[in-house]
């Protein structure tokens, strides 16, 4: 979604005003122009799929265009004005599809080269003003082995949305390759979600949740990590990614420990992360943001848009003596947070001090999330489809000096892979952090996770 000061016009000369969602309003607070911040050309989501089987590029082009026609948010602009902004839906336009040959040359394994191809595209800029907010790249090793990469702007999609897009794209591709069009029900559009939020802004459920958060976050600030260098207002961000995969034994222990403790893996990982923040900052009362899918009602499960929601997790470890105690606090904090989830913008209205670290040039807020794969495709376990098979490239091990960006701070993401491994990434601004610091944080986290899953009665004082 592009942000502009003048309402763009549709082909018939009209511009229908659609209200912004709370998340779109929140993103506007991090608007730093077209090259940085929430609407910058690197605030993007780029994902890749390994493709096995012959690809009909004409059918792929038609399928991409079908997806843009189906999901309005991919052709929507955010308009800034004195009334707080609005969004405008544009007519469908062709998706840019770039086809590249990836011939075998230096003996590098194809899996590695596929990841390199994905990383190169992840590092590229995609201006938010260019519609539609979807670009596709097909890298071909040969006629039956390829990599498909989809790039979107993060103000128009989220991680869940990309799974929906890919599912719909595969359905449209198979129909087009067979000479027809996909028979899919009408999509629920993101603008309907924005209206739903406005219509339910003062409901009883919202009021009860706001009361919960006011009490839960009383006196709290999001915990920031001291950066190696202070932020400089005139220096644009320079994000990179440190990637890692924990060994199979540790990954197995974490998953089994979570099951034994009647927790989700996220609760275990969040407990370890809270202890990491405690050790790095010296505070025992930590608050860190995570992300949810933001889809409060089932009817939005198949919708595309920036639904993702900032959810603050407060874990007070002040009177905890062991790692097991911290896990108990983590479980309770997570359950309470998700039971009372509302748009973060509403939480921030009632707890403005929560965001203070974002204005502190010496602190960086590092959000922590566990990725969700909502719609696994054939390559990850589904029947014998007609045509090529698609498997998402989730096990990524190659770090990037230059990557897609986030509006501010850092982002720590974990993923429980289909084979049980724990993979992760830490996205950080090179202007504020050294890569050595990122590696140290990951190693400290690994140490804490090992202790928590293997010896939960370990006293915190002995870590």
Task: Indicate where each model-derived feature is located.
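Short amphipathic alpha-helices and their capping loops
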Residues: 1-36, 61-109, 117, 132, ...
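His-Asp-centered acyl/peptidyl-transfer active-site segments
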Residues: 11-16, 35-44, 61, 72-73, ...
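Acyl activation and transfer enzymes in specialized metabolism, enriched
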Residues: 51-75, 150-167, 240-282, 301, ...
């Amino acid at each position: 979604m592009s942000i502009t000061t003048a309402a763009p016009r549709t082909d018939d000369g009209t511009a229908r005003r659609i209200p912004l969602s709370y998340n779109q309003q929140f993103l506007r607070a991090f608007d730093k122009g077209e090259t940085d911040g929430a609407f910058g050309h690197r605030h993007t989501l780029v994902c890749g799929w390994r493709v096995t089987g012959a690809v009909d590029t004409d059918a792929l082009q038609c399928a991409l265009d079908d997806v843009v026609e189906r999901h309005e948010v991919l052709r929507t602009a955010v308009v800034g004005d004195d009334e707080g902004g609005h969004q405008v839906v544009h007519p469908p336009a062709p998706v840019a599809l770039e086809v590249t040959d990836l011939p075998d040359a230096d003996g590098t394994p194809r899996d590695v080269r596929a990841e390199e191809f994905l990383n190169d595209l992840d590092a590229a800029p995609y201006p938010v003003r260019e519609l539609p907010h979807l670009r596709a790249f097909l890298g071909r090793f040969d006629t039956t082995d390829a990599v498909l990469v989809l790039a979107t702007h993060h103000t128009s999609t989220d991680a869940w949305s990309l799974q929906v897009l890919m599912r719909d794209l595969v359905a449209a591709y198979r129909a087009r390759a067979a000479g027809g069009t996909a028979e899919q029900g009408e999509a629920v559009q993101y603008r309907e979600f924005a209206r739903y939020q406005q219509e339910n802004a003062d409901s009883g459920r919202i009021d009860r949740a706001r009361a919960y958060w006011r009490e839960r976050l009383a006196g709290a600030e999001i915990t920031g990590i001291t950066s190696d260098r202070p932020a400089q207002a005139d220096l644009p961000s320079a994000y990179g990614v440190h990637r890692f995969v924990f060994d199979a034994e540790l990954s197995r222990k974490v998953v089994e420990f979570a099951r034994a403790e009647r927790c989700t893996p996220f609760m275990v990982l969040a407990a370890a992360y809270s202890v990491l923040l405690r050790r790095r900052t010296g505070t025992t009362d930590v608050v860190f943001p995570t992300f949810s899918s933001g889809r409060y009602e089932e009817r939005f499960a198949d919708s595309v848009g920036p639904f993702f929601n900032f959810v603050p997790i407060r874990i007070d470890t002040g009177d905890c003596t062991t790692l097991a105690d911290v896990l108990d606090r983590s479980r309770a904090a997570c359950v309470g947070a998700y039971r009372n989830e509302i748009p973060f913008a509403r939480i921030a209205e009632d707890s403005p001090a929560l965001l203070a670290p974002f204005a502190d040039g010496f602190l960086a807020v590092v959000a922590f999330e566990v990725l969700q794969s909502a719609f696994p495709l054939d390559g990850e376990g589904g029947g014998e489809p007609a045509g090529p098979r698609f498997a998402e490239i989730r096990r990524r091990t190659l770090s990037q000096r230059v990557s897609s960006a986030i509006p501010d701070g850092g982002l720590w993401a974990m993923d429980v892979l289909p084979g049980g491994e724990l993979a992760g990434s830490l996205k950080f601004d090179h202007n504020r952090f050294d890569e050595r610091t990122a590696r140290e944080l990951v190693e400290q986290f690994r140490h804490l996770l090992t202790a928590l899953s293997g010896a939960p009665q370990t006293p915190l004082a002995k870590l």
